[in-house]
């Protein structure tokens, strides 16, 4: 079924005016019929009947997502990687993707897609993977990540083998992945001084997108264990 996005709450019987970008999408995929699904950022999924640019809400379900909230912070990658990260982490059920400028980042925050573009990418990813709530995408400072980190709720992916393999418990809600060039001594020391657990994956050198997906999968799998 065709899935469309609207940034408002749904009530049965209400009529929603579809945003212009959703109408453009609808015109490219519609193959007859007037039924579709509408989703928003509140976890609501509505069955709707479409007439012109209006959607009449016939039924509303609430689908909480994700089951295991996890925020993933990634050292700023090249702009071309942003779309891939948003799509992949959306499919994995991540709550939030935060980009931060690391000492060895090869790009700057100013080169990130605009907030509007990031939002459209998150909506498109949610549409494709049938995720009710689009991924939240933010930009943060490295220092704020350290301040938000704790022994119990944070895991840092580290390319150095001596980081070991920290156990991931169900209470972990923040995964921090370094930039393409790896952590600087200053950044690594900041996490060590804060006693934040570090985790090393025994693999060859990973690109930042691969590292983020692999570490996220590891965390989600271990969060699900009894």
Task: Please place each PLM-identified region on the residue numbering.
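Fold-independent oxyanion-binding glycine-rich loops
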Residues: 8, 20-21, 41-42, 76, ...
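RNA substrate-binding interface of SAM-dependent RNA methyltransferases
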Residues: 62-155
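Short amphipathic alpha-helical segments
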Residues: 86, 111, 168-169, 187-190, ...
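N-terminal positively charged helical leader segments and presequences
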Residues: 1-63
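Structured adenosyl-cofactor binding patch, chiefly the S-adenosyl-L-methionine
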Residues: 185-226
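Glycine- and other small-residue-rich loops at beta-strand/loop junctions that grip anionic moieties
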Residues: 74-75, 180, 204, 208
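Active-site/ligand-binding-proximal alpha/beta "capping" segment
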Residues: 148-190, 196-201
């Amino acid at each position: 079924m065709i899935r469309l996005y609207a940034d408002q709450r749904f009530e049965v019987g209400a009529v929603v005016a579809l945003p212009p970008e959703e109408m453009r999408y609808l015109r490219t995929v519609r193959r007859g019929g007037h039924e579709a699904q509408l989703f928003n950022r509140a976890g609501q999924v509505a069955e709707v009947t479409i007439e012109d640019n209006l959607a009449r809400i016939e039924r509303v379900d609430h689908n909480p997502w994700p089951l295991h909230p996890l925020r993933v912070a990634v050292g700023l990658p090249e702009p071309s990687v942003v779309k891939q990260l948003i799509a992949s982490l959306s499919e994995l059920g991540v709550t939030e993707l935060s980009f931060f400028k690391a000492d060895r980042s090869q790009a700057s925050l100013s080169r990130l897609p605009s907030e509007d573009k990031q939002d459209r990418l998150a909506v498109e990813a949610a549409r494709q993977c049938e995720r009710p709530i689009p991924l939240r995408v933010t930009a943060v400072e490295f220092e704020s990540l350290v301040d938000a980190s704790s022994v119990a709720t944070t895991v840092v992916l580290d390319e150095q083998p001596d980081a070991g393999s920290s156990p991931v418990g169900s209470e972990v809600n923040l995964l921090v992945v370094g930039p393409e060039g790896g952590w600087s001594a200053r950044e690594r020391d900041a996490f060590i001084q804060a006693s934040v657990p570090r985790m090393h994956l025994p693999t060859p050198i990973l690109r930042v997108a691969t590292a983020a997906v692999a570490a996220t999968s590891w965390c989600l799998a271990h969060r699900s264990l009894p």
